[in-house]
């Protein structure tokens, strides 16, 4: 329970009317509403998950809300990021999110951080809030949030979406598991943590998962005991079903991290990343002075749509099955790419663990098409 000594605050007639449906609930009443008003929540990411979470947190009467996001609104966001409209395209997500929140609840104190959460700023930002809602979609950001919350003793409410499935959990709650405990226990093939742009997502799915994250935050503030600590709640939109899975602890969860995240990490099996940009890759391919193989670690469907010339498709889900054994990777250098970065980081660490010579291509196929164009690029004809 947060704000267990919440002081009685003065409510206007408008506020009594606004929160009247809360005030008549015996589980909330005036005391619970005061807890909400005196609490602070930081939402890292104002996209698919952040949009519904921010809307309902503001409407519920959270007193202070922080938003971390440096993205610009794109038309492709509108399918799932319900805070934004066509009139907002090209504008800052953080700025527009604040504007919309204040339209919902003008009494809310909204702070925006128009930046990306990184190891150099995470502690300073996160320390200002009681609860952190994780609306990110990549390994690095989630580990930074997890480690910062552990250091500052903050609650980390995790959410993730992939195609038609989503999951929610609460980490670092009263000595419970953290994100690293969960991530180190799930199957590689189910955990490339692809972004929506990489793998697609049903538009309404983040609305469900983001709302569940906001619900967890409110329950914690009000002191409810039925929190998703040590449990992953998984939702399948195709079958309209929920499942719960227990998280197995992999280490003493209260131990502080030896150092903050300063590089790309995957679980506890990380390596100094050897990487090149697409210009350097192009030059290496022209020289052709050593034995190499280009590995496209995206899905088969993405590979068939477009891929680099002579690239071999090795989806992440197939790595656990050792489908790479016929490629003789031990005899050559492997250049790895995906759509942007997230899956190639995962693949890099996995193959390095097998002691293969691996180089990651920064920015992936997206960077290649933006900088180099269609040269040495196969694109499926219509």
From Swiss-Prot:
It comes from the Eukaryota. One of its GO terms (cellular component) is chloroplast. Residues 288-377 form the Rhodanese domain. One of its GO terms (molecular function) is ubiquitin-like modifier activating enzyme activity. It catalyses: [molybdopterin-synthase sulfur-carrier protein]-C-terminal Gly-Gly + ATP + H(+) = [molybdopterin-synthase sulfur-carrier protein]-C-terminal Gly-Gly-AMP + diphosphate. Pfam families: Rhodanese (PF00581), ThiF (PF00899). It is found in: Plastid, Chloroplast. ATP binds at residues 48, 69, 76-80, 93, 137-138. Keywords: ATP-binding, Chloroplast, Molybdenum cofactor biosynthesis, Nucleotide-binding, Nucleotidyltransferase, Plastid, Transferase. InterPro entries: Rhodanese-like_dom, Rhodanese-like_dom_sf, ThiF/MoeB/HesA, ThiF_NAD_FAD-bd, Ubiquitin-activating_enz. Its EC number is 2.7.7.80. Gene3D superfamilies: NAD(P)-binding Rossmann-like Domain (3.40.50.720), Rhodanese-like domain (3.40.250.10). One of its GO terms (biological process) is Mo-molybdopterin cofactor biosynthetic process. The keyword Nucleotidyltransferase applies. The keyword Chaperone does not apply. Catalyzes the adenylation by ATP of the carboxyl group of the C-terminal glycine of sulfur carrier protein moaD. Belongs to the HesA/MoeB/ThiF family. This is Probable molybdopterin-synthase adenylyltransferase. It comes from Porphyra purpurea (Red seaweed).
């Amino acid at each position: 329970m947060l704000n267990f000594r919440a002081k009685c605050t003065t409510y206007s007639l408008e506020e009594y009317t606004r929160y009247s449906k809360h005030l008549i609930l015996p589980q909330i009443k005036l005391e619970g509403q005061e807890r909400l008003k005196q609490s602070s929540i930081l939402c890292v990411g104002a996209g698919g998950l952040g949009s519904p979470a921010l809307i309902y947190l503001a409407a519920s009467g959270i007193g202070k809300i922080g938003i971390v996001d440096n993205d610009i609104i794109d038309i492709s966001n509108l399918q799932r990021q319900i805070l934004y409209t066509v009139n907002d395209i090209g504008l800052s997500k953080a700025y527009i999110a604040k504007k919309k929140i204040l339209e919902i609840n003008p009494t809310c104190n909204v702070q925006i951080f128009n930046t990306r959460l990184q190891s150099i700023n995470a502690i300073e930002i996160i320390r200002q809030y009681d609860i952190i809602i994780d609306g990110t979609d990549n390994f690095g950001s989630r580990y930074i949030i997890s480690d910062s919350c552990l250091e500052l003793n903050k609650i980390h409410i995790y959410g993730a979406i992939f195609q038609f499935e989503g999951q929610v959990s609460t980490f670092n709650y009263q000595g419970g598991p953290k994100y690293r405990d969960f991530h180190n226990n799930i199957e590689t093939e189910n955990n490339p943590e692809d972004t929506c742009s990489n793998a697609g997502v049903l538009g309404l799915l983040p609305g469900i998962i983001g709302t569940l994250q906001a619900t967890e935050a409110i329950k914690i503030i009000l002191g409810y005991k039925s929190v998703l600590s040590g449990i992953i709640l998984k939702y399948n939109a195709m079958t309209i079903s929920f499942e719960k899975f227990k998280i197995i602890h992999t280490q003493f969860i209260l131990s502080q991290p030896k150092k903050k995240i300063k590089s790309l990490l995957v679980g506890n099996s990380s390596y100094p990343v050897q990487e090149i940009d697409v210009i350097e890759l192009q030059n290496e391919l022209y020289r052709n002075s050593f034995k190499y193989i280009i590995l496209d670690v995206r899905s088969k469907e993405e590979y068939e749509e477009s891929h680099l010339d002579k690239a071999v498709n090795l989806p992440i889900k197939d790595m656990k099955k050792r489908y790479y054994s016929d490629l003789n990777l031990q005899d050559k250098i492997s250049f790895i790419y995906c759509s942007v970065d997230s899956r190639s980081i995962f693949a890099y660490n996995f193959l390095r663990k097998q002691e293969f010579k691996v180089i990651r291509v920064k920015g992936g196929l997206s960077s290649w098409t933006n900088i180099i164009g269609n040269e040495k690029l196969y694109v499926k004809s219509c």
